[in-house]
Regions:
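Short acidic/glycine-enriched loop/turn segments that link adjacent beta-strands
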Residues: 37-40, 62, 102-105
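Short beta->alpha transition motifs characteristic of CBS
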Residues: 5, 103-104, 110, 121-125
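Vicinal oxygen chelate
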Residues: 10-13, 70-114
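Conserved catalytic-core motifs of GNAT/GCN5-like acyltransferases
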Residues: 27-34, 97-100, 122-125
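N-terminal beta-strand motif that seeds the catalytic metal site of vicinal oxygen chelate
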Residues: 1-16, 68, 125
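Long, continuous compositionally biased terminal/linker segments
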Residues: 40-73, 77-82
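Core segments of cupin and vicinal oxygen chelate
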Residues: 8-51
Length: 125
């Protein structure tokens, strides 16, 4: 099980605005600053209201090295993420659709964030 992911982004403000809008349809709406004992003022976190598990760190991104997949509860949530992410400035890589070549019930979309990170949202029904 994965506890958290940290993406390096080139512009905090732009990326925080993008992810706040794009992840909202997935119920990932909690934006917080890291407040651990060891500092890290350069971390901004998103979560589900219980804990932060998706973090942004400002620096020099390497988007070719990153693919992050988020879980959606149904097809409508996949579609809503795709629209919200593109409306927030992301670039559609692949529109929402069934991917039976992966296996039956796989429905997903892919969007590139403002730095080019490859984001997937999938419902496995």
């Amino acid at each position: 099980m994965i506890d958290h992911v940290i993406l390096t982004v080139s512009d905090f403000e732009r990326s925080v605005a993008f992810y706040a809008k794009a992840l909202g349809p997935l119920g990932i709406t909690n934006y917080i600053d890291y407040e651990g004992q060891d500092g890290h003022p350069d971390l901004k976190g998103f979560g589900d209201g219980k804990r932060a598990f998706f973090w942004l760190k400002e620096g020099k991104p390497d988007p070719q090295a990153v693919h992050v997949g988020f879980v959606a509860k149904d097809h409508a949530e996949v579609d809503a993420f795709s629209k919200a992410a593109v409306d927030a400035g992301g670039k559609s890589k692949e529109a929402p659709r069934a991917r039976h070549e992966y296996y039956p019930g796989y429905y997903a979309t892919w969007v590139l964030d403002p730095d080019g990170h490859d984001l997937e949202v999938v419902h496995k029904g």
